[in-house]
From Swiss-Prot:
Induction: Expressed in the early phase of the viral replicative cycle. This is Type II methyltransferase M.CviAII. It comes from the Viruses. The keyword Methyltransferase applies.
Amino acid sequence: MNRIGYIGSKLKLKDWIFEEISKRTDDTYTKFADLFAGSCIMTHEALEKKYECISNDLETYSYVIMNGLKCPFSDKLQNIIETLDDLDTKDMVIPGFVTLTYSPRGNRMYFTEDNAMRIDIIRENIERMKERVSTDEYNFLLASLLTSADSVKNTSVVYGAYLKKFKKTALKRMVFAPLHTRSTTVTLETFNEDATELGIKTDIAYVDPPYNSRQYGANYFVLNQILTPKEIGNGVTGLPEYKKSSFCRKQEVAMSFHKMLKNVSARLFVISYSSESLLSKGDMVALLSQYGKCEVVVRNHKRFKAQISAVGNDVEEYLFFVYIEQ
C-alpha cells in the first residue's frame, strides 16, 4: 500500500499491536473496527489478516483512502493510471487550483509548479471520468492521487507549514502510482463520522485518537483541498475552515472517550495512547476501568522526528485493552 506521511502513524508499531491483540483473542473475533483510521495503515493491516473491517475517520482524505482500499486493483485501473500519468501539463489551458494556490505561482511552496500542474490535470481528468467508473474505482483513483501528491510535498511531514527551499524529494516528478495492487475483494464498511457518534457493533474496536492538541484537519488540509477546494484563509498557508476533533481539547477529551465507549459496541477495545498524551496513564486506567477490566502494555517508541532535538528520542507508547462484559 502506498501511504501518506502521517503524525502518529502505526506503520512501525502495527506488528506489535496485532501481536498483542492475538494474545487476547481467538477465532471468534472476526470483526475489526478502526475508529480513527487516519492514513489507514491499521485498516489495511487488518484486511491483510482477513478480518471483516469497519473503518472510520472524521477527515475526508482518510475516508477517500479507506474507500480506495475497498476497491480491487484491475487491468482497467492500471490502464487508467498509466493514461493519467502520461498526461502533458502543456495541454492545460487555465492553471488549476493547486497550481494557483499551493505552488510558487500562488506564492506558496507546498509543491513545485510542475507537480502542482500534474496534480491539477490528473484531478480534473479523474472528475471527467466519474460517470465511466464505479464509485469504488473513483475513490481508488482519488486516493492514488493523494498518496502520489504526498510523496512530493515540500514539508517536513505535515502541511502546517512548507519549507523555504524545495527539498530533493519535492523536486522529483510526481509519479501517479496506484494506492495498492491487491486484486482480491475484501469486506470493508466505511464511515466519515465523529467516533463518539459511531453506533457500530464489532468484536475488536481499535482506537488511535489524537494524542494532543494538534488538529489533523489543520495539519493535512492540503489533501482535503485537492479533493474539494474550499475558500482559502488568510496567512502564509492559506488554511481554510476545517473540522475539529474534541479529542484534541484537554477539557473535552475525557468526556469524548466516555461517549465513544458508550456508543460503540465491542467485545474488546484496544486503545493507543502515549506518555505525551492529554490524559495520563493513570487517568486512562481510571476512566477505562468503568467499562470493564483494563490492562495496559507499555513499549518505548521513537518520538516523531521533528521533535527529537528539542525533547529527546523516546516516548512511552501505551496499548490499553478493555474487556467488555457481554
